[in-house]
Amino acid sequence: MLKSFSLIGKNITKNVSLSSSNKFLFGKNHQNMKSIYSSIRFFSSEQELPPRDSDQFDVVIVGAGPSGLSTAIRLKQLSEKAGKDLRVCVVEKGSEVGSHILSGAVMDPKALNELIPDWKEKGAPLITEVKQDKFYFLTENRSLRLPTPRLMHNEGNYIISLGNVVRWLGEQAESMGVEVYPSFAASEVLYHDNGAVRGIATNDMGIAKDGSLTSNFTRGMELNARLTIFAEGCRGSLTKGLFEKFNLRDECEPQTFGLGIKETWEIKPEKHQQGLVIHTLGYPLSDELLGGSFIYHAENNTVNLGLVVGLDYSNPYLNPYQEFQKLKLHPMVKDMLEGGTCIQYGARTINEGGFQSIPKLVFPGGALVGCTAGFVHVPKVKGSHYAMKTGILAAEAAFPQLISQQEKEQEQEQDKPSVEPLLINEYPEELKKSWVWKELREVRNYRPSLHWGTIPGLIYGALEMYIFRGHTPWTLSNGKPDNERLKPAAECKKIEYKKPDGQITFDLMTSVMRSGTNHEENQPIHLKVRDMEVAKKVNRDIYDGPEGRFCPAGVYEWVEGEKGEKELVRNSVFCLHCKTCDIKDPTQNIDFTVPEGGGGPKYGAM
């Protein structure tokens, strides 16, 4: 059931009231939201579902990550400067702002400097400035230090917890009047009769696993807006539908992804070097696998350790989680971790398609910002500053149209907002003039060149980086989508992994417990299998159940059923919302949909 609203860790309850038309008003200084939810509960699963209650905003933003919150903050800054008032709402499926955020992370403060120039004075949690970069090529037992590539230099950048930065951004947004609602999972895009986006709906709560309504059933809400900004992060569940409805990917290449698996450790003080940034290529990944590791020495003797595995791999027996365990047994890494304590674990997919995989960004009534659109600099292993910049640009493009429509309605004394869709074409136009576009275009050939192998890819990447600087007349292709890359199990060699030692390496369930993930068990499974027979005939019989290995949370298992054949079991309570299954399933037979709001991981300083 829904909980009262506790924003960004504070004991602040958002207040609402019912208008004469029985619609929600989220604003402050009204009666308690919880009492209104009580008024729309229903006590029998046999009752016909009523219409959703609704509310009207100027802008609704889906996702309280760096892109969504930057959009909200810039809109409020522009409103204040112009003496206007815009009602801006941010909905977040995590239990609090930041609870679903996982990143390395080393942050380039360029976009933050633009958004909030006095961020230091306001206490932004950018604490550890990078002091040294190191770059290694690893073999099974050795490490060869190489010159750090130009684009991987981190002078002036900060080792951060992106979750903590996002929590701080949420506080800044709220202080400016942005309405931020965690535990609200956007489950549906709403459309006007003319096909334009008119907002989103949150999912119903209190539906039992068998589909019946519990005594705590609560209808979802419609959040209508002049403009809806989708900032869902990598592989957004609503964004997938928008790609198809508005043909947003017709003129770009398929996106390609990586799976990032991360642990935070507290290590011995004598082994800690605050401000040190290490990136590696090579071991534990074989030459045909794309990816690499990162080791970031943050404050308080903590180290952020992670491995990114390209999801365009072909061997269905590959297990990214086990590859990460292998990394920790490398002498350079193991020596650092010995005597330390693993504090947190998590996983999340990352866009790696780059420049050639960026979709169309605007459509009637809406826009895409940040990682949901694929803005990640692969060589730099960074995306948060791009997320923030795209949010800033989207807000600046939208603001004049929002105010113009608002003023027009006031002149005509309209009671209801206009249904004329906003189309903020200025956003992609300004983006193409920005440093984001320039930088992504410059490195567009780096990721696809690695398909030639690690060493040839590094040589070509060096030529691109130092000689051509992105000015080559060609653009390399990312090739087939990741889900089409797997080879049949019969053509591949099984991979044997060592048992965990419980000190440096861990069994999967021990790690999952460190993520804090949790879901209401009595709810429909949110990982939908469209056709279970396809899963059996393709996933099980041809690829030997790859979802049991590519999932970094142990959600999927093939277990012997009553008829003696293996059946697919989904332990969705363990789900980390990483979206790997949605991406890598060979026939795109698995769909990630949002569970009840507030479910999923509860990442702390990840």
From Swiss-Prot:
PANTHER family: ELECTRON TRANSFER FLAVOPROTEIN-UBIQUINONE OXIDOREDUCTASE (PTHR10617), ELECTRON TRANSFER FLAVOPROTEIN-UBIQUINONE OXIDOREDUCTASE, MITOCHONDRIAL (PTHR10617:SF107)
Cofactor(s) listed in the protein's UniProt record: [4Fe-4S] cluster; FAD
Compartments (UniProt record): Mitochondrion inner membrane
Pfam families, sorted: ETFQO_UQ-bd (PF21162), Fer4_ETF_QO (PF05187), NAD_binding_8 (PF13450)
Oligomeric and partner information: Monomer.
Function field: Accepts electrons from ETF and reduces ubiquinone.
Highest taxon in the source lineage: Eukaryota
Annotated positions binding FAD: 59-73
CC per GO annotation: mitochondrial inner membrane
Family: Belongs to the ETF-QO/FixC family.
Keywords: 4Fe-4S, Electron transport, FAD, Flavoprotein, Iron, Iron-sulfur, Membrane, Metal-binding, Mitochondrion, Mitochondrion inner membrane, Oxidoreductase, Transit peptide, Transmembrane, Transmembrane helix, Transport, Ubiquinone
Protein name: Electron transfer flavoprotein-ubiquinone oxidoreductase, mitochondrial
Single GO biological process annotation from the record: electron transport chain
Cofactor remark: Binds 1 [4Fe-4S] cluster.
InterPro entries on file: ETF-QO, ETF-QO/FixC_UQ-bd, ETF-QO/FixX_C, FAD/NAD-bd_sf
Lineage: Eukaryota, Amoebozoa, Evosea, Eumycetozoa, Dictyostelia
The enzyme's E.C. designation: 1.5.5.1
Swiss-Prot/TrEMBL catalytic activity: a ubiquinone + reduced [electron-transfer flavoprotein] = a ubiquinol + oxidized [electron-transfer flavoprotein] + H(+)
GO molecular function, one term: electron-transferring-flavoprotein dehydrogenase activity
Listed Gene3D superfamilies: 3.30.70.20, 3.30.9.90, FAD/NAD(P)-binding domain (3.50.50.60)
Binding positions ([4Fe-4S] cluster): C551, C575, C578, C581
Predominant place of localization: mitochondrion
Segments traversing the membrane: 448-468
Natural source organism: Dictyostelium discoideum
